[in-house]
């Protein structure tokens, strides 16, 4: 009996010793693997870049554009950019491959081929009737024309801000603007807007509600009109509804994925003086104009700096959506 007990105890002790040996062996193996792994990391670390230092720009690139040393992915690598320009630019350049040339130049700034779209428009008036902006970032080039300052200013106000709009039935109802952010926006091939302010008895102030010839004319044969009248006063309106549509709109705030670039002109259009523009900064810039090639070269050179002043937004703009909400 004692022999069996001794054998059992001996077997137990041997098992404990073997288990201890196995555990120590495993520990030594794990230490060996971990230390070797850390040694490899230490050796290779000088050869690895821990951060993304941005796009490797060629020497001919813009040195004026600041690039932040950041691990954040650059937005333009996964975004689309639309460039709107007047048709006279393509006419002057007179080169069938000029868009391909610009695409290659945008590539040097980090915009992959196929991410930049070129869209032309005939003139400011026609563009204001049917603005369509579907890209993540939208740059609108407007050549300065002293005779079109008002149209350019109103178009910039329309594009650079979001508006909540509702239809107006001017044949049945009077309308009033509640505050400075409330405007009446008209679009069409020819918009002539006349207004007649009313007193509390709905009688015309300086006009007859039954005679549109006595109404005050605030716009004549325009394609885009942003009408501002005295707040809190009812008005009867007369609009050329056969060629124009009018909407009651409320300015909600800036549309941050749009920038307007004024091309040429001694004066810079400024819509920030409008009390409804908050904050008092806008994505409206100016570049010198001599030739359109020079303009496009400047845009390419500063595109990333311009985009940094904008914010990527998913909401698109077109004339149909504008009437209700943009």
Curated annotation (Swiss-Prot):
Glycosylation sites: 69, 238
Binding-site residues for Ca(2+) 2, renumbered to this chain: 177, 228-229, 231, 301
Domain of life: Viruses
Chain residue ranges for the region called GPR motif: 253-255
Signal peptide: 1-50
Name assigned to this protein: Outer capsid glycoprotein VP7
Residue segments, region CNP motif: 165-167
GO molecular function terms noted in the UniProt entry: metal ion binding
Keyword field: Calcium, Capsid protein, Disulfide bond, Glycoprotein, Host endoplasmic reticulum, Host-virus interaction, Metal-binding, Outer capsid protein, Signal, T=13 icosahedral capsid protein, Virion
Gene3D superfamilies: Glycoprotein VP7, domain 1 (3.40.50.11130), Rotavirus outer-layer protein VP7, domain 2 (2.60.120.800)
Binding annotation for Ca(2+) 1: 95, 206, 214, 216
The protein's assembly and partners: Homotrimer; disulfide-linked. 2 Ca(2+) ions bound at each subunit interface in the trimer hold the trimer together. Interacts with the intermediate capsid protein VP6. Interacts with the outer capsid protein VP5*.
GO cellular component labels: host cell endoplasmic reticulum lumen; T=13 icosahedral viral capsid; viral outer capsid
Primary role: Calcium-binding protein that interacts with rotavirus cell receptors once the initial attachment by VP4 has been achieved. Rotavirus attachment and entry into the host cell probably involves multiple sequential contacts between the outer capsid proteins VP4 and VP7, and the cell receptors. Following entry into the host cell, low intracellular or intravesicular Ca(2+) concentration probably causes the calcium-stabilized VP7 trimers to dissociate from the virion. This step is probably necessary for the membrane-disrupting entry step and the release of VP4, which is locked onto the virion by VP7.
Entry PTM: N-glycosylated. The N-terminus is blocked possibly by pyroglutamic acid.
Cystines in this chain: 82-135, 165-249, 191-244, 196-207
